């Protein structure tokens, strides 16, 4: 009734009955509307697959956008608009305090993990200065993480010809809500110079299923071209793969005709990854031009390349496996890496998918164990470990935040994962962890550590929002005369 009333009041305007979104407690939908819009929030790269799948569903005019009660009035041609999405990139503190010399008044607003006050103290107490020299270095790193998340999400939106528009949340940070393209002072974020290409009416997109490679692998990508400019016959996409700052390979894809309004698929792209001697940064660059050479769209994706020799260990161990359900294929994976699978009495290391009393006893007697925490039951609640370790599924609500999602989920208030570079010299140095780590980013976090007292024990972790709720992703500590390493990284079988 309100939709009809407002449409008659001003027939020149589009009317949206309810800008719909899915929430944990109050799912909502459209009944009658001129725009079929929806809000979707997923953290990328952590939940990139969930984003990809939901956007693909949305592009098909999914029924979950509409009332399930049989009372909808649909024409079937309401434009599909993703009217809210985005992620966080913290502002530089030096810019916020430049005029007054102290924290802004709104730092004491916001609740829990989105309350800014005390961020510098938490930064120091969490040991994050081992990764980023200053809080402003951390802030800029989260901004680049925000950009790569938006780049992926916008790329997925523009792959689908049926989706006619999107609205990034938001133009500027709104006080503590740090998902703006600009900071609260209307200043640029670190990626500002990349925004024209990202938000251009014309866009070139390479859809990669992975961004981490070994030398000798093949990079494959589905390439699409979106256009909302003047018609043009012909053109090409020029691509190059740069490794360590130098062009290693380059080539071209033909464009028969530019789309005038929408998206077309081009030929797929296959690029052989060159061999490297050490882990290397790489960039895939694409430029789409008209036949006369005028550039209309460009894009750049950051990749990581590891030496082919890194597939196998340089220090093989005798490893005992405890994986009762054999879900993760741990033994096969370790054998492929060059380790010898033996019984527990002969092992240098026990690798297990769950902790048992027998494993604890072996560690107490001097043994070492690696526990791959892939479920909440991997460590029994009554365990006899030297640290009181808790496991939490990131997508599951937590009792400490009643009525809210788990803070570590990261879909609305971003969570960021990190590793200590000096502890993992053979891995890409990407903090916060980016798409090079997508396949192993964890579903669970480890709780119970004290960031100050246990700082040297935690070599990978996660924080949320304004540097709150620290959690461990790799936690190693002494157990009796031996030691245990716990990790929630999904190191088998996906990777």
Which residues fall in each region the model found?
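Short, solvent-exposed loop/turn segments at secondary-structure junctions
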Residues: 22, 42-43, 86-89, 172-175, ...
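Helical hinge/lid and interdomain linker segments adjacent to catalytic or ligand-binding clefts
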Residues: 315-391, 487-489, 494
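Extended acidic/polar, glycine-enriched regions
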Residues: 268-311
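Beta-strand-rich binding/interaction modules
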Residues: 218-257, 266-270, 279-290, 331
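Substrate-binding/catalytic cleft of secreted carbohydrate-active enzymes
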Residues: 1-173, 177-186
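Extracellular ligand-binding/catalytic regions of CAZymes and related secreted enzymes
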Residues: 180-182, 186, 237, 297, ...
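Aromatic-rich peripheral "rim/lid" segments of glycoside hydrolase catalytic domains that contact
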Residues: 9, 149, 154, 160, ...
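A glycine-rich, often tryptophan-bearing local segment used as a flexible ligand/cofactor-contacting loop or short
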Residues: 354-447
């Amino acid at each position: 009734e309100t939709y009809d009333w407002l449409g008659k009041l001003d027939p020149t305007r589009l009317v949206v009955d309810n800008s719909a979104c899915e929430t944990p407690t109050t799912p909502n939908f459209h009944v009658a509307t001129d725009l079929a819009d929806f809000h979707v929030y997923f953290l990328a790269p952590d939940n990139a697959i969930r984003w990809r799948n939901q956007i693909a569903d949305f592009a098909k005019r999914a029924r979950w956008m509409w009332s399930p009660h049989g009372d909808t009035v649909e024409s079937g041609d309401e434009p599909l608009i993703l009217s809210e999405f985005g992620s966080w990139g913290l502002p530089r503190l030096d810019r916020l305090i430049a005029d007054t010399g102290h924290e802004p008044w709104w730092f004491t607003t916001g609740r829990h993990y989105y309350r800014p006050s005390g961020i510098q103290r938490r930064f120091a107490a969490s040991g994050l200065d081992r990764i980023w020299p200053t809080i402003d270095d951390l802030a800029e790193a989260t901004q680049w993480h925000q950009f790569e998340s938006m780049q992926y999400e916008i790329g997925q939106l523009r792959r689908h010809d049926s989706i006619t528009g999107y609205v990034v949340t938001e133009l500027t940070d709104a006080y503590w809500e740090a998902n703006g393209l600009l900071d609260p002072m209307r200043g640029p974020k670190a990626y500002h110079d990349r925004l024209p290409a990202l938000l251009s009416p014309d866009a070139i997109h390479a859809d990669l299923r992975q961004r981490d490679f070994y030398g000798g692998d093949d990079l494959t990508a589905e390439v699409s071209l979106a256009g909302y400019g003047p018609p043009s016959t012909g053109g090409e996409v020029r691509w190059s793969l740069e490794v360590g700052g130098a062009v290693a390979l380059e080539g071209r894809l033909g464009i028969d005709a530019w789309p005038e309004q929408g998206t077309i698929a081009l030929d797929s792209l296959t690029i052989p990854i060159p061999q490297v001697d050490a882990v290397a940064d790489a960039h895939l660059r694409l430029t789409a031009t008209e036949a006369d050479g005028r550039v209309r769209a460009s894009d750049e994706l950051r990749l990581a390349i590891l030496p082919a020799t890194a597939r196998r260990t340089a220090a093989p161990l005798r490893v005992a496996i405890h994986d009762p359900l054999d879900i993760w294929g741990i033994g096969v994976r370790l054998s492929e890496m060059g380790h010898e699978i033996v019984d527990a009495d002969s092992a240098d290391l026990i690798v297990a998918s769950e902790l048992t009393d027998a494993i604890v006893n072996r560690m107490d007697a001097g043994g070492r164990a690696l526990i791959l925490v892939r479920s909440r039951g991997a460590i029994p609640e009554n365990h006899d470990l030297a640290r009181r370790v808790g496991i939490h599924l990131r997508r599951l609500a937590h009792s400490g935040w009643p009525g809210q999602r788990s803070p570590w989920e990261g879909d609305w208030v971003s969570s960021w994962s990190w590793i200590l570079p000096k502890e993992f010299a053979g891995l890409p140095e990407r903090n916060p962890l980016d798409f090079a780590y997508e396949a192993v980013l964890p579903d669970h976090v480890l709780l119970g550590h004290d960031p100050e007292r246990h700082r040297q024990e935690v070599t990978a972790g996660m924080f949320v929002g304004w540097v709150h709720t620290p959690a461990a992703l790799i936690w190693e500590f002494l157990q009796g005369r031996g030691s245990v390493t716990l990790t929630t990284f999904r190191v088998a079988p996906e990777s």
